[in-house]
Every structure is written in C-alpha cells, then in structure tokens.
C-alpha cells in the first residue's frame, strides 16, 4: 500500500511518472481526491516550473532539500547546468540500481541499499545518495540476488536499461559506463529540466 500511495504522485502531476503498468494513472488519468474527476487546471508559469520540479523529486524519490543541493552542485560545475543536474541525479546509487532493471522501483532500490544489500566495487554502501563513479560496478549481495522482487524485475524487463549502463543479469551487477546527458535519459514521462532550472533561478 505504501508504494500505491507513492504512485498518487503520477495522478497529481498528470503523467505516468515511472511508466509502470500498475500505475493508477493508466486507469484514472485525473487528480486524486473528491473533486479529481473535474480534471486538471491550466497552470501558471510558476505552476509549470513547480510541477517540473516535483516530477524530478518524485521520480528520483528525494527530498526538496536534496534536490536543491543537487541543483547548486550542478550550477557550480562547468558545462550545461541541465546536463550537470541530470548527470548528478543519474549517478546516485539508487538511480543506478533502479535503472539497471534489477529492482522493480526506485523505492525498492532505496530499501535494498538502506538494508545493506548492495555493494559498490565489492564494498557495502548503504547510502542512496552515494555518487557512483564511471567504471564502478554495483552488485547485489548473495542474499538479495534471490529475492522474489529482484527475480520478477529481471523477468519482466519492464524498465528500459539505458545504454550508459552495462548489466549482467546472471551476476546481478551493473557497471556505470558514462555520465549521461539530459537528452540520453529514457524517462517514461516528459521531464522538463529547463523549467527546473527556471524554478531554482527565481
């Protein structure tokens, strides 16, 4: 039920945020609540920026404070702020594990990490925000490899694995090949990083 409550974000934002078949938005594409079936209101410019910010926040399952910190790091780095922002988010350990398709959701990725079921280059890491470096190998511990959720996720192949990850489904491991640009990330929904930059630049 906890995951179902998290999926309410899709209905609030008007998109199937994670692109999953069980997403309630697929059958009830209107906002949650008593008057939800009245549809979505046309948002203001700020409303669009705020919604874009919310999409990223929910998609990566991070707090507003964490999002702002990621933006500040991206802004200070050389290069395109949008690419830097997305690159930092995609480099998080929870994102790498989720995008590998070895787990069904970003929430299950965070749970496995916090329960110390995940190795980075052979060492246990239990921090979801840990930044994985190019060339690093993320592996599930032996006990986690046979979890029903892991086996089901691999068999379903519901999540498209991006080409900047190299996944070994036998070993239950994933190698980070390169930091992606915004345009390379196969988001299931439209993610407008330019509006997020505008939101934080107000």
Curated annotation (Swiss-Prot):
**One GO MF term attached to the UniProt entry:** structural constituent of ribosome
Among the GO biological process terms of this entry, one is: translation
UniProt cross-references to InterPro entries, sorted A to Z: Ribosomal_uS4, Ribosomal_uS4_bac-type, Ribosomal_uS4_N, S4_RNA-bd, S4_RNA-bd_sf
Give a yes or no for keyword Nucleus in this entry.
no
GO cellular component term, pick one: small ribosomal subunit
Source superkingdom: Bacteria
- Domain S4 RNA-binding as annotated: residue spans: 91-168
What keywords tag this UniProt record? Ribonucleoprotein, Ribosomal protein, RNA-binding, rRNA-binding
Q: How does it assemble?
A: Part of the 30S ribosomal subunit. Contacts protein S5. The interaction surface between S4 and S5 is involved in control of translational fidelity.
Record function comment: One of the primary rRNA binding proteins, it binds directly to 16S rRNA where it nucleates assembly of the body of the 30S subunit.
Q: Which HAMAP family would you find in this protein's record?
A: Ribosomal_uS4_B
Protein family: Belongs to the universal ribosomal protein uS4 family.
Put simply, this protein is called Small ribosomal subunit protein uS4
Q: What gene name is given for the protein in this entry?
A: rpsD
